[in-house]
Amino acid sequence: MKKQSIYLLMLTVILLMGCNQDAPKYIIGVSQCSVDIWHDWQNAEMKTEANFHEGIELRFADANSDPEVQSKQIDSLVASGINLLIVTPNQLSSSSPAIDRAHDKGIPVIVFERKTESRKYTAFVSADNYEMGHMMGEYIASRLGGKGNIIEVMGPKGSKPAEERYNGFHVAIADYPDIKVVAEIEGDWTEDTAYETVKKWEGDLNTVDAVFGHNDRSALGARKAFKERGARMPLLCGIDALPGPDGGIHKVAEGQLDASYIYPTRGDELIKLAIAILDGDRYPKETMLSSALVTHDNAMVLQLGSDEVVRMTQNLNKLQAKANGYKQQIATQQTVWILVGVSAVLLLLSIVLAILYFRSKRLAQKQS
């Protein structure tokens, strides 16, 4: 009886300690096709927004631009027990089957930026990549006066955003017969690759009047190549216009880029949408995010606003970290008090059992 009572109390302690740990209400898996400044900012926005909601756990996976890796990571996230999947697909031909498998298992899927081939998703969020390319084409044509040579540093083959930006750009400049794209260079969204490929281009960089990078890092990599080869600096335009000291807004304000186009990350909206889906609330099936051109004319104003957003986000994250620390301290204190209480009960039970044992022993001796 003594051992059974002790085991029962130990089980009670374990259960109480388990109850003391708050289980997440929702587990949201995030599958990013690559790691870069743009996706880092989106992840940070998701983390900040999740802090405003009780019981949200985020699980991130980064495929480092490898579609096969992303497919495996999606399957792994699903197997880990997530309640919803947010995914930015790499190459749709490779990623779509894994997304379909998640959807077929009843897991809601939010697809960002690229629609899957099967359309098996719960919601889709993106900006208009075709419009971005078209607007950049019009802007560059206007700045060049309808005449000049352009190097285009594209995104990787198979990338839907790169394809749409390319199409929009070329439709825009088709109206200007004296504008020539003298080189179409495939990149991978990184500054280093753009730098290496532009530097190795066999043409005369001094004949180039403009560079259109499919993102800001590509345009900045081209800028580095022009500078290293001692060539005349062309008009430099990209897409993303992220906030922060390394973002495109700052680069335009500082004069390193001539223009960029805001490609909104909106990680906060993705989390809000995810919670609405999980809570059973009404939500839009498709959301198109608004964007805008950033030039020297508006970059300083946008920079001031974006700097304030960055500062507030950092402060909120610090406050959340402190709050989590206090919460953990309280949970630890509660656990300690539970252990003290149970220890006291165990001690009291041991005393009672000892008294009963000696009484029964004494009674047995008298009877004998």
Protein language model regions, located:
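Short beta-strand elements in bilobed, periplasmic/extracellular small-molecule ligand-binding domains
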Residues: A50-A63, I150-E152, I173-E191
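Bacterial N-terminal signal peptides
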Residues: Y7-L16
